[in-house]
Amino acid sequence: MSKEKFQRLKPHINVGTIGHVDHGKTTLTAAITTVLSKKFGGSARAFDQIDNAPEEKARGITINTSHVEYDTEFRHYAHVDCPGHADYIKNMITGAAQMDGAILVVAATDGPMPQTREHILLGRQVGVPYIIVFLNKCDMVDDEELLELVEMEVRDLLTQYDFPGDDTPIIRGSALKALEGDPEWESKIIDLSKFLDSYIPEPKRAVDQPFLLPIEDVFSISGRGTVVTGRVEKGIIKVGEEVEIVGIKKTTKTTCTGVEMFRKLLDEGRAGENVGVLLRGTKRDEIERGQVLAKPGSIHPHTTFESEVYVLSKEEGGRHTPFFKGYRPQFYFRTTDVTGSIELPEGIEMVMPGDNIKMTVTLINPIAMADGLRFAIREGGRTVGAGVVSKVLL
């Protein structure tokens, strides 16, 4: 059977379910696909299909994730659901499944629990921009006052982590009843789909963002000058435009005098393309792998930042022993390793394999960075952790 062609007729948005264990994330995921496939087409996915999540690797880390897709009235959604709490943490820190918004599932029977808080905090740290709340298991709570109390608690928790708690949509529903086809509860899933469409704005596509190309290789071509190669991460580079070379050394400006792909000359290079960029008047030894080409002023070099880090367990090929303050591994950003030292939060003496931790990192060389940039932690080329820049400091 030939693969059917993917028709991109609606805007595409990435979302995921987050929340405490057993609050109904996977049941809700199944209910969304089931209810929406009846109304807007697409295929329903059963609970056990989603729950048996396949293993995938992201930045050397094994994560179990289930990917489902569905249509709402106005959009196409790719939705990620993770079976285990550790999988969520890894997923959010590595950015394996980037989310434009998240559906926070809270059981009305329990209210917010420790992982509810942890997922909201992680969402804030790793840059999940929007959260919608699905108050689940409402069929099991008769007391209106209790529901209002739980709602208030959730709003307070969101506000505590700088999400707009008072304005966050909260849908009261029952994922199980909706999955069983009860029309009263099915309508709540439709309500949720409407909030997904209206509350999560369409993200800015990579091609519309300021130009950025992480440099992978540098060549000198006699009679033509210096060419850098790499995959355009964001934006567009046109022949004749000024660019900055940022990171490791002092920032310099130059002009793009040519763009080529597969030995053909182009007028421009776009996000997602592997290109060679010819630079005017730049010497081969002035540029190195690990720097970036960028639109002038759009990104700056930094050495010190706060980060959220997941440390690989021994089973994942990570360290067998804990590390302490003063630990100096390499931090792998985009295309290169830079040595750095760490500071642990007050009262924390050591970090065990399998932990996730907030740490402040100081690099020996500056790297072009902004909040949300992902990195790996390595020792002699072996990945021992994954992290995300939560706040640039210096």
UniProtKB/Swiss-Prot annotation:
Q: Which residues form the signal peptide?
A: none
Q: Which GO terms describe its cellular component?
A: cytosol
Q: Which Pfam families match?
A: GTP_EFTU, GTP_EFTU_D2, GTP_EFTU_D3
Listed binding positions for Mg(2+) are: 26
Write the record's keywords in alphabetical order, separated by commas. Cytoplasm, Elongation factor, GTP-binding, Hydrolase, Magnesium, Metal-binding, Nucleotide-binding, Protein biosynthesis
**Region (G3), start-end ranges:** 81-84
Database matches in InterPro entries:
EF-Tu_GTP-bd (IPR041709), EF-Tu_GTPase (IPR050055), EFTu-like_2 (IPR004161), EFTU_2 (IPR033720), G_TR_CS (IPR031157), P-loop_NTPase (IPR027417), Small_GTP-bd (IPR005225), T_Tr_GTP-bd_dom (IPR000795)
Look up the domain of life of the source. Bacteria
- Which amino acid positions bind GTP, per UniProt? 19-26, 81-85, 136-139
EC number of this enzyme = 3.6.5.3
Catalytic reaction(s) noted = GTP + H2O = GDP + phosphate + H(+)
Residues of the region (G1) are 19-26
Q: Where in the cell is it found?
A: Cytoplasm
Q: Which intervals hold domain tr-type G? A: 10-204
**Looking at its record, which EC class is this enzyme?**
hydrolase
Q: Region G2: start and end of each range?
A: 60-64
This entry's Gene Ontology molecular function terms read: GTP binding; GTPase activity; guanosine tetraphosphate binding; translation elongation factor activity
Identify the stretch(es) annotated as G5: 174-176
Region (G4) location: 136-139
Biological role stated in the UniProt entry? GTP hydrolase that promotes the GTP-dependent binding of aminoacyl-tRNA to the A-site of ribosomes during protein biosynthesis.
Q: Which family does it belong to?
A: Belongs to the TRAFAC class translation factor GTPase superfamily. Classic translation factor GTPase family. EF-Tu/EF-1A subfamily.
Question: How does this chain assemble?
Answer: Monomer.
- Under what name is this protein listed? Elongation factor Tu
Gene source species: Buchnera aphidicola subsp. Acyrthosiphon pisum (strain APS)
